[in-house]
Amino acid sequence: SGVPIIPVYFDGQNSALFHLMGKIHPLLRTVRLPHELSNKKKKTVALRIGHPISFSEIEDFTTLQDLGAYLYNRTYALESHLYSHDFSNLNTYGEYVPKPVDPQVLAAEIETRSSDKLFSAGSYDCFFSSYKDIPNIMHEIGVRREESFRNVGEGTGAEIDTDKFDTYYKHLYIWDREKKGIVGAYRLGMCKEIIKQYGIDGLYSNSLFRYKAPFIPHLEKTIELGRSFVALSHQKEALPLALLIKGLFYVLLKYPDIKYFIGPVSISSWYPPLYRTFMIYYLKQKHADSKFSGLVDPIEPFEPQAGRVDVGAL
């Protein structure tokens, strides 16, 4: 007919007796239907309506069986639902009251790091420093990390988010000259240097993944990225994140032997298990590197949770 199909999901199910009668004989289930409808009086039934499936999408299917499977999975995918964009209910550590460093103290320390400056853009400066040279800035980075991560239901629960890896990793950060504050930061691990001094256990990522022997030589040409954030005060701006990414390219100019960036990325538990399963499936199908994917194993592998949905059918 050339019209789109709209998937509609009703939350809930008929009684166990209804399904039992259906196993005895399909007609018994039909006889039971009026009662199943009447026993829903004064009950709230959630209804979710999905995006229309265009006729052009429908035409791509060559068999009714494949189309039916697709429609079935599109409908039951609505069973998982994002209720709001409020992450506060995920914060198990309570309200975070940041204890920032005095802006004048930060500004004074910034003045001593002119040799670490990579570039300037408007009122922003990008720096690349060692931990030992920026004690006050590192404290502020730890405060803003914790503040940012708590805002999305994560964080450490401590007053500042710093750890032992910070002490020998490098730090890329953006400074706002006008507001005298840290806008965002990245932690960078120069893998070759770290492995030489601390062994493979010196890499943060090694606490989450196990690298097989054939992968180790590639780490000598790799920078490990992590702990990135943009301060809450600047998250509505696009520029800070763009400047951090630009900073990564400037770092590459300082280390011409580097060929790879690696690093773990969090998927917030705010997303329902089905949504996380979709993300992982998509990344594996579309972006996995066959050369390297078999050389790194997660210590705690992701367990797909798709319920009644066949992720591969969508």
Locations of regions flagged by a protein language model:
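Conserved N-terminal entry element of GNAT/NAT acetyltransferase domains
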Residues: T92-K132
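Short amphipathic alpha-helix that is part of the acyltransferase structural core
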Residues: L118-D161, T167, H171, V183-G184
